[in-house]
Amino acid sequence: MGDSVVLDPLDVWRLSQGLHLSVDQLLAGKIELGVTDGNILPHLRMTGAEERCVYLNSNGRCSIHSFRPGFCRLFPLGRYYEDGSFKYILQIHECKKTSRSKIKVRKWVDTPDFQNYEKFVCDWHYFLLDVQAVLYESEDSDLIRNLNMYVVNQFYRKPYDEKRDFYEQFYAVSYTHLRAHETAANL
């Protein structure tokens, strides 16, 4: 699996809350930073020759199932992004299970406040594409490093208040930064 389970800010927030660990404590052993499409983003650490998720127990079962990342919640579904939105797709060759039953995506993904979750997922995806465009257009290594670390620090490492709604906090941070990004792009 390698670094294929890329984490978004909600995933890291859920892991931090569920495991009662700070983001820095998670980065010290359970998650790692890696480059994904030019962006430096956290992903679940994999171990051993088989590159197994650190959260799989000895029986191969997920030990963080109730607060597992969105990528894990989605599998074997995927998302196809187009025109500022996305559609769910079924990756039929990814799942070994042969007896499949119909289930609503909302139930499968099993996340509270599904409408806000889908908005967040879409907004985060397109924000990263905007960041990626800046990274690919620049040859300034300092700008590339600083922009990547800015995203990591502002959206992952900066603590979210566990007593407040995640989405409210995310959009308070992202709105400010997205507006600054748009202003800079128009200069």
Give residue ranges: language-model regions.
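Nucleic-acid 5′ end/cap handling module spanning
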Residues: 170
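Long, charge-rich alpha-helical interaction segments
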Residues: 143-151
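Conserved small/polar residues in nucleotide/adenosyl-binding loops
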Residues: 176-185
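Hydrophobic scaffolds flanking metal-cofactor catalytic centers in soluble metalloenzymes
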Residues: 1-134, 158-159
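Terminal transmembrane helix and immediately flanking juxtamembrane interfaces
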Residues: 155-164
